[in-house]
Amino acid sequence: MKTLLLTLVVVTIICLDLGYTEMCNMCVRPYPFMSSCCPEGQDRCYKSYWVNENRKQEAYHGKYPVILERGCVTACTGPGSGSIYNLYTCCPTNRCGSSSTSG
């Protein structure tokens, strides 16, 4: 009985923590995606794209933009920040950037 009670308490604590922890998909080419909790203070997810000199996203075989990296950041400086060949965009959702989400 004590073991069952202890198990319920541990599961409750874990579930409560998951509700307040930002999860971002982490990826550096090549695959796979890896979801990870963001460090404290880094509560925004971002995606990094390869762009050409006109700041347009480069497509992979004309199908979709090449995402170079995903991760956590403290704050977003706005859409389209980054260097001339690397475009960073923040995601509006938790665990953004997977193949099943558009953000």
Curated annotation (Swiss-Prot):
Signal peptide range: 1-21
Tissue localization of expression: Expressed by the venom gland.
Source organism of this protein record: Bungarus multicinctus (Many-banded krait)
One GO CC term on file: extracellular region
Subcellular location: Secreted
Location, primary (coarse class): secreted
Leftover remarks: Negative results: does not bind to muscarinic acetylcholine receptors M1 and M2 (CHRM1/CHRM2). Is unable to compete with alpha-bungarotoxin for binding to nAchR at concentrations up to 100 uM. Is not toxic to mice at doses up to 3 mg/kg.
Nuclease in keyword set: no
Intrachain S-S bonds: C24-C45, C27-C37, C38-C72, C76-C90, C91-C96
Protein name (Swiss-Prot/TrEMBL): Cytotoxin-like protein TA-BMBGT3
